[in-house]
Amino acid sequence: MLYLIAEQLGFPGVLNLIRYITFRAGAAALTALFIGLIIGPRFIGWLRIRQGKGQPIRADGPQTHLSKVGTPTMGGLMILISVMLSLLLWMDLGNRYVWACIGVTLGFGLIGFMDDYDKVKKRSTKGVSGKARLLGEFLIAGLASWLIVSGNGTQLYVPFYNGPVIDLGPFYVVFAAFVIVAFGNAVNLTDGLDGLAIMPVVIASLAFFVIAYLVGNAKFAQYLGIPHVPGAGDLTILTAAIIGGGLAFLWFNAPPAAVFMGDTGSLALGGALGVISVVAHHEIVLAIVGGLFVMETISVILQVFFYKRTGKRIFRMAPIHHHFEQLGWSEPTVVIRFWIISFVLALAGLATLKLR
């Protein structure tokens, strides 16, 4: 909004700063951070009153989790409010990529909200059916992918290789939708401990802040041999807002958590990262940067597959963060070590930009 106003005025005086993506990104991060910190206490109090007993806790989970009974969920709404208000202020709302990303983020957030609401209402750990959720997610992701692809090409790029490896043509829409849905659910699976999911989301957003900026700059893209996507630079503002809103949420989600983000937040944030990677043509790099989320997802797939085939479990409990809890690791130990893994993987993902 401010960008369009300043543009109409010709960027006079101090408003010339708004012309620069880096300035707007920094402002977006701070705006989301302060909004989250300001609304947090009252919002959490309101959730606690409305939900009563809070998020249902799995009876078959680690016994230490029973102390979390009564903690409200749907804290992802707090993140979405702070991020969206920040975006409305600082993003170029004339950029269609912006609306594709906002659509996925809010759409996935709505599906997550419906799931959280169902769980709280039924006092059950099972919400909306998996098939209904996936159908809604693929419809949203498919529409966004079609909007992106219509002016962004259908080439697939992979790390360590200069230039596209294949043109997927119309199948790119299916591939892109799969990436968005898969990553949304991967973040959702990871959100099982206080602070576990949100910090890796912040770290991945920081990595894609760099990637989106480089992809959106013709000179940097040519120098690094990565795809140049005009307009993608504005997605740095979205990643910055997620960083700010995520850190504000972590203030209240740090152990012992005062609120859980729920599916409302995890699906929305995972979907946002997925669609950003599609716009930037760095979908494979997302699997490296967000490798922690991939690891959590694979642990669940392997657990289910081997249990159905052999009747035995590979892990004591899945997702894998619960396995380490069952081995005797304390919750903060699991969380911090997984943060470290996430940071290392983000650095590895960024390194692929130069190694070609």
UniProtKB/Swiss-Prot annotation:
InterPro entries: Glycosyl_transferase_4 (IPR000715), PNAcMuramoyl-5peptid_Trfase (IPR003524), PNAcMuramoyl-5peptid_Trfase_CS (IPR018480). It comes from the Bacteria. Its main location: membrane. Keywords: Cell cycle, Cell division, Cell inner membrane, Cell membrane, Cell shape, Cell wall biogenesis/degradation, Magnesium, Membrane, Metal-binding, Peptidoglycan synthesis, Transferase, Transmembrane, Transmembrane helix. GO terms for molecular function: metal ion binding; phospho-N-acetylmuramoyl-pentapeptide-transferase activity; UDP-N-acetylmuramoyl-L-alanyl-D-glutamyl-meso-2,6-diaminopimelyl-D-alanyl-D-alanine:undecaprenyl-phosphate transferase activity. It is a multi-pass membrane protein. It catalyses: UDP-N-acetyl-alpha-D-muramoyl-L-alanyl-gamma-D-glutamyl-meso-2,6-diaminopimeloyl-D-alanyl-D-alanine + di-trans,octa-cis-undecaprenyl phosphate = di-trans,octa-cis-undecaprenyl diphospho-N-acetyl-alpha-D-muramoyl-L-alanyl-D-glutamyl-meso-2,6-diaminopimeloyl-D-alanyl-D-alanine + UMP. Its EC number is 2.7.8.13. GO terms for biological process: cell division; cell wall organization; peptidoglycan biosynthetic process; regulation of cell shape. The chain crosses the membrane at residues 27-47, 74-94, 97-117, 134-154, 163-183, 195-215, 220-240, 241-261, 262-282, 284-304, 333-353. It is found in: Cell inner membrane. Catalyzes the initial step of the lipid cycle reactions in the biosynthesis of the cell wall peptidoglycan: transfers peptidoglycan precursor phospho-MurNAc-pentapeptide from UDP-MurNAc-pentapeptide onto the lipid carrier undecaprenyl phosphate, yielding undecaprenyl-pyrophosphoryl-MurNAc-pentapeptide, known as lipid I. Belongs to the glycosyltransferase 4 family. MraY subfamily. This is Phospho-N-acetylmuramoyl-pentapeptide-transferase. It comes from Rhizorhabdus wittichii (strain DSM 6014 / CCUG 31198 / JCM 15750 / NBRC 105917 / EY 4224 / RW1) (Sphingomonas wittichii). The gene is mraY.
